[in-house]
């Protein structure tokens, strides 16, 4: 879990877009390996995609 102070700091809008924090939008708040399109970290993305809870996403098979 992310610290409460970091979550509050993340809500402030930065002067430049690249200075913003990317944290997992799910409950974990992980700061690394965040997919911006889905606002999820790779771990949460994998769990939700395997359960079929993200529309249009499925596991690749070839």
From Swiss-Prot:
Output the GO biological process annotations, alphabetical, semicolon-separated.
Answer: translation
Domain of life, per UniProt, equals: Bacteria
Q: What positions does the entry give for Zn(2+) binding?
A: 24, 28, 41, 44
What is one GO cellular-component annotation here?
ribosome
Which of UniProt's keywords are assigned here? Metal-binding, Ribonucleoprotein, Ribosomal protein, RNA-binding, rRNA-binding, Zinc
- GO terms of molecular function: metal ion binding; rRNA binding; structural constituent of ribosome
Cofactor(s) needed by this chain:
Zn(2+)
Pfam families recorded for this chain? Ribosomal_S14
Q: How is the cofactor bound?
A: Binds 1 zinc ion per subunit.
| Record-linked SUPFAM superfamilies | Glucocorticoid receptor-like (DNA-binding domain) (SSF57716)
Q: Which family does it belong to?
A: Belongs to the universal ribosomal protein uS14 family. Zinc-binding uS14 subfamily.
Protein function: Binds 16S rRNA, required for the assembly of 30S particles and may also be responsible for determining the conformation of the 16S rRNA at the A site.
What assembly does the database describe for this protein? Part of the 30S ribosomal subunit. Contacts proteins S3 and S10.
Protein name, per record: Small ribosomal subunit protein uS14
The source organism is Spiroplasma kunkelii
Gene assigned in the entry: rpsZ
């Amino acid at each position: 879990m992310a610290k409460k102070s970091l979550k509050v700091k993340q809500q402030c809008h930065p002067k430049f877009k690249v200075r913003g924090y990317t944290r997992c939008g799910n409950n974990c708040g992980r700061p690394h390996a965040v997919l911006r399109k889905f606002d999820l970290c790779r771990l949460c993305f994998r769990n939700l995609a395997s359960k079929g809870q993200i529309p249009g996403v499925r596991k690749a098979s070839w």
